Amino acid sequence: MRLLMRDGKCNICGERVRMVRESLGLSQEALAARIQLNGHSLTQKAISRIEMGLRIVPDYEIPLFADALNVDPLWLIGLDPPQIHGGAK
């Protein structure tokens, strides 16, 4: 299996996860605990590897981080939230 990387990293959300986690004053262990409270198993080591860009983040984990950090999942992957403009009348 060939691993695709971008700018030498396995994910695009790790830096944003770290930025928000640190701004909230959370340790990696505390973030892991928040995610585990929702019934999902992510360890401190996994979060460390994600933040360093050494671990792939499957699409199903993006909402886990978004919920635990109270951010928009689209922002985590580098996209702005969709803009809704006036609909058809």
Where does each model-flagged region fall?
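Hydrophobic micro-packing sites on short alpha-helices
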Residues: L31, E61-A66, L76-I77
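Residues that mark the N-terminal boundary/hinge immediately upstream of a DNA-recognition element
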Residues: R16, S27, T43, P58-E61, ...
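Short, basic-rich loop-to-helix N-cap that marks the start of a DNA-contacting helix
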Residues: K45, M52-D67, Q83
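A short, Lys/Arg-rich alpha-helix, primarily the initiator
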Residues: M1-L24
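Short, charged recognition helix plus adjacent turn
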Residues: M1-G8, D67, L74-K89
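Short alpha-helical DNA-recognition segment
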Residues: G25-R49
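Alpha-helical residues within the helix-turn-helix
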Residues: E22, A33, D67
